[in-house]
């Protein structure tokens, strides 16, 4: 199949469906507003039908049609609600229930009004019983449901309280919870679920997916005529859609009653009953009885349980068919050998359960059974479930008044040619629980003798371990294998005699089973071979392979004193021949015989010919170049390979233009940057500096309409009375990019609003939108023009909800909110996606896009813009900002930021903004409540006090303290795949299956998490064989009685993810577009599964936490790891030891094994442990480290191999300085280089030489300042005082004092360096920004601080583990007599100027000479002159080479290869570019003291 067809699979699939019967709206954005009821809204409830509603909420959906046209949809009749327990009896008549509802309704309305009343003469004050119009509570009714929090069977009755104002929901629930309404406290249910999430869950809607309505009402005019967008955007597809659904006699609303409020093309109104997505819900009433136990669920729909998961599976199946892939089959399941779950305290728990069972049972002799345990009261059938009760308050279908002012009547009953199908994200259809592993065949180990270590053996083992810790050997391998061998001997001694007798008997029996005769001869056993020797050595406790220990190749580096650290002594030797012990021949006679002078036979052969020139040339070309020596003045890179230069890999597909789909299902995106002329070196201030130019760029692939306009453009303020040739120059500079000129800034802003209204983008973005881009424009309009441009940019004219000072948004995403549009602050979006030391656009472009961007100061840009006579400078400014706008789109597209958030929204069900704005609990809840609602579960809403009062978390995951050491043999890494989700599935842990704490169970007042509940009598006796007791003592129902809701949710997630990943592997690398789409989906699934446990354990800000459930999950994970460790270490054939474990992973050391054996053993371990755990818990063999270093918890590094065929290792580090961002680049490079040298050579002499060389460079200043920049987050306003502020904040504060606009964003990374200062000066007072450092020629890096405080401590943490003290190596360095030539203090300049050394050869002067030359150099004048010239030319050449690099970089802006480009390139001050630092250094080399001295000497010598 061709690439084109692959890239448009989605659109092809959509077009293949039949003509749609639905009017479809993509749910891109939503909010709500309050209004007076219209005939499209409910006007009264059923509990108090005589009282009218004073106001009702309406939901606004900002979306798009399949044709790409924007639409605003008003949804009427959706009311927020919550539940409380019904205080009556099931035997109450319907009349009595209605009376109770009316009384509750009246009480609520009165008490809530009173709580809102602030003055005595408040107009809402009640007189008698006259309620009048209802302001807060719409209706109260009775529904039946199952409480979700705790194990409940049988229907419970609840009051459903429907409200009129969603913003009052939280306050009303607190009043009821605190007992201020009814005089007693009630538990609240589902009040923590936000209004908009409630409606999307009830109607089966998902963010960025389609709302299907069978009809709608249009507001007049049907097509908006503002800016003639109706004429510009109308096309055949839209006309066909309108012809089908728009009947001007029946469904066009009156302008008087329903005026247009939106600025978009189409505006419609719908009622709840029009939404057909709800019909796809699969409702399951299975928890009011033991239906799952009795097997009465054959006609009830099964998984996938969420429609988004179901749609995802259907879409994947269709895509596989389009790609001609085989039908998807679930991976084969590993055979399990799990009979029962025995925890450490299982015996104790069973005894407690029997006591609880006795305590909660009756003594009438009757044995309870599942068939008649629940009282099947027929009155429940007359009461609705929440699902059935939803339509009660829906407005009735109105008779629409004909709108005579509309366009001419039209009818067309033909179906529309839909070019799409529903594209929603999916779920799972398979019984594949959890991620499945590799298909390794099961190995039988039945031939191994079984032995159990006795307590005596354990004591001996402990003695061996104690002896090991006190040993003075360097290598652990021998001690570890000796320890394992002793355990084998002790365990095998019991069966030794039986084995020997059996072997003797077997020798007398032939292979056929007959006994040998008396005279029979039997072949003797062959002599032992190489493998027998290895096996014997292993049996005796010697490693099969004794890998080389670290050593010194240079014997001079060996110290006389022993190498010791932390009570251990390390035997480090040298491989040099001088350190070897000589062989003594004392007392022995050595005879030397003369060799015969002739040979009986002689043979001759031709010698190899010397290689030809071509052969040498070919060989040389094949050998990778080691590069030149110019980097000697910089910190050595950790690797010469170019693939390590970039932090993130290239994206080949990103360079290709993505093909538009015929169905619009993305979000349109407009980005913008501005240029403002400033004053001197100040940052532009919106209160002073006007915007001179606006550069906008529309992401072409997201814009579906063909408006015959460009996708990028420029707006410029230029008065016609000024330079008349300026517009012509601009147009000449920018070629085909459209440019518009405006007389004033205000006119340009008005044109910008018109542009936004015309394009109507869903997303507005800028690299930094608070101080620049949109934020600058908004602030400028407010302060100077008194013009609220935010209202003009919004998608509505009234009921506008905007925010300009959202504190949380300012610190985490965007502090600006524009109604109907999403705002993306690009640098902050990247901050959550990628780890960079700085988040400037130059750093992001280089690391993500692999593009180096020049940076000019605002002062330079202002000067170039004002120099209007220079075309090159104008062109530079225009291209500078235009490229930045283009980079904005490229960065988001490269990271798939928008596409990934869309996929999450479609899967989880929340809107696009909530994906990146809301936390993980909100996402879990969205998915969870959809399953709960389909099964009539009602969720508890605990208050903050309830959350604080629940039992504290007690269990912690297993995080072993590693045996810190250098491991020279293979180290296996095993990882449980999705451990916590798999535990919840495998052991059926959930809110809905919790019965209680086994030690405290009784019939009433069972404390569990944030709630208390009662148990029906005899329930424990009934469930005696259908419960699981978790290792923390909480009892859960098994799947035979009730499959947990969390299990259903996670099964959907994990199964679909497995299907997606398998499809990704099968489609290969050709179809990159589809692969990126699938990758975004699997990432969304992975993130959702990983945060589910956090939802249960959120003990501070939890929405529905349960500490007992969270402890069950954690403790089960802990004991699962402990069981795995026991299985691994008991198998004697592996000779393995677990040296580290962390939550869900194990590090297993194999002393003396080969890497190939390590892979084989690793797979066997993973399979064995998996077999001993319930489905779907799966232990995966991840990789082999060889060699490696374990430093401490969560800190380790090693050479990683993921397959036996892998030849080149991957440097894999976690938690150490090479991957941390709180240090400096030099620290990362030096430490990684040292670790690589240790792993590759184990030669400590090479490491010592390398380190001393780097330390020496630092001391003499022969380094790049960029490598020594710290970049730490700054949170101004979060520090107690200026005295406690960190160094970065001090640097920023100094900058703000000079320019108030220089204040950084919250958590922005600020670079700074540490320089030498006065004695006693504080560290933070010696910190300067890179700008200050480069401007101050008298500043010098504090080499002692960097070496002793930044470099040596982390190196010591690594090399102390092998007995090496790096600090001693640093002290051996002979410090340079000369100070740095580039960073010398003022007092040093004088000293160097009068130093008694020759400025040519460096020899000490015997007498003072004006030329600063020694007698020898004076005598050899020609040689000295030549030396000066060579040095001068070398410096000049280096400088010119660097200037050429800068000119090449800036050429993309100037398109000028002349002198002017050279001048512009010199203005670049990109502090993210290493060339900039090198250029500044080279420039200073040409004018430092030594260069001046040499120049003066050269002039004086010029007379020769």
From Swiss-Prot:
InterPro entries: DNA-dir_DNA_pol_B, DNA-dir_DNA_pol_B_CS, DNA-dir_DNA_pol_B_exonuc, DNA-dir_DNA_pol_B_multi_dom, DNA/RNA_pol_sf, DNA_pol_B_thumb, DNA_pol_palm_dom_sf, DPOD/Z_N. GO terms for molecular function: 4 iron, 4 sulfur cluster binding; DNA binding; DNA-directed DNA polymerase activity; nucleotide binding; zinc ion binding. A motif (CysB motif) lies at residues 1446-1473. It catalyses: DNA(n) + a 2'-deoxyribonucleoside 5'-triphosphate = DNA(n+1) + diphosphate. One of its GO terms (biological process) is DNA replication. Zn(2+) binds at residues 1398, 1401, 1414, 1417. GO terms for cellular component: mitochondrion; nucleus; zeta DNA polymerase complex. A zinc finger (CysA-type) spans 1398-1417. [4Fe-4S] cluster binds at residues 1446, 1449, 1468, 1473. Its cofactor is [4Fe-4S] cluster. Keywords: 4Fe-4S, DNA damage, DNA repair, DNA replication, DNA-binding, DNA-directed DNA polymerase, Iron, Iron-sulfur, Metal-binding, Mitochondrion, Nucleotidyltransferase, Nucleus, Transferase, Zinc, Zinc-finger. Forms DNA polymerase zeta with REV7. The CysB motif binds 1 4Fe-4S cluster and is required for the formation of polymerase complexes. Belongs to the DNA polymerase type-B family. Nonessential DNA polymerase. Required for DNA damage induced mutagenesis. Involved in DNA repair, mitochondrial DNA repair and translesion synthesis. Translesion synthesis in S.cerevisiae may use a specialized DNA polymerase that is not required for other DNA replicative processes. Has a role in the bypass of abasic (AP) sites. Highly inefficient in incorporating nucleotides opposite the AP site, but efficiently extends from nucleotides, particularly an A, inserted opposite the lesion. This is DNA polymerase zeta catalytic subunit. It comes from Saccharomyces cerevisiae (strain ATCC 204508 / S288c) (Baker's yeast).
